[in-house]
């Protein structure tokens, strides 16, 4: 068992040496860059939020890194934010306590952060409510500007994709067509009653 483990480790080391020697782009970025990207993403969310309170990240994960050159890269992150007790004027939400309660606003967010030499150059972010029970109208109230700005920059987001539910529009149209083609049951019932009265009057 130990011999097999040693062979696996040796093969792994040799493989990494091969990729580095063959000119494969290996970017050893500082872990602090990830924290900078997350902080910039949360700041972007708070700048576009219409809530009177600041949001703070609860969980985060790095989904993809696109290396543009030796100094510039683009990070794609996914994270969740929750409303804190600090007002917008507080500035930094990192030390703010989370609000308590059943209906505290929590959102799932995606961001694309462009960094150069360890410094944040540009940030794009988009959020949706983590709870499916929230309505689209309430989402627009707090994150109204973010959805519009995201759609405008869709073609520029190097590897950042947002999966919109394509079936919603078709579903709404089908309901509308059904409503136009078939009047409600009580109206059909009234029409039948009217015809019955007219026919009985001529008899």
Swiss-Prot record:
Post-translational changes noted in the entry: Multiply phosphorylated at serine residues. Phosphorylation sites are present in the extracellular medium.
Domain of life assignment: Eukaryota
Residue numbers carrying Phosphoserine: 90, 137-138, 174
SUPFAM superfamilies: Cystatin/monellin
Pfam family, one: Spp-24
Gene Ontology biological process terms in this record: bone remodeling; protein-containing complex assembly
Subcellular location: Secreted
Keywords from the named record: Disulfide bond, Phosphoprotein, Secreted, Signal
GO cellular component: extracellular region; protein-containing complex
Cystine crosslinks: 86-96, 109-127
PANTHER family per UniProt: SECRETED PHOSPHOPROTEIN 24 (PTHR15444:SF4)
Similarity comment: Belongs to the SPP2 family.
Record's protein name: Secreted phosphoprotein 24
Annotated gene: Spp2
């Amino acid at each position: 068992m130990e011999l097999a483990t040693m062979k696996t480790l040796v093969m792994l080391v040799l493989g990494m040496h091969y990729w580095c020697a063959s000119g494969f782009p290996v970017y050893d970025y500082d872990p602090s860059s990830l924290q900078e990207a997350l902080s910039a993403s949360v700041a972007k969310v708070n700048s576009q939020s219409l809530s009177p309170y600041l949001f703070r990240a609860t969980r985060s994960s790095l989904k993809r890194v696109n290396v543009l050159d030796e100094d510039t890269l683009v990070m794609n992150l996914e994270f969740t934010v929750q409303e804190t007790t600090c007002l917008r004027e507080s500035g930094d939400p990192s030390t703010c306590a989370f609000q308590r309660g059943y209906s505290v606003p929590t959102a799932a967010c995606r961001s694309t952060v462009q960094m150069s030499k360890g410094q944040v150059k540009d940030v794009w972010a988009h959020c949706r409510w983590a709870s499916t029970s929230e309505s689209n109208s309430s989402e627009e109230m707090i994150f109204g500007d973010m959805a519009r700005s995201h759609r405008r920059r869709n073609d520029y987001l190097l590897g950042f994709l947002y999966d919109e539910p394509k079936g919603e529009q078709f579903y709404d149209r089908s309901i509308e067509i059904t409503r136009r083609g078939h009047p409600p049951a009580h109206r059909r019932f009234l029409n039948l009653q009217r015809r019955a009265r007219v026919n009985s009057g001529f008899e």
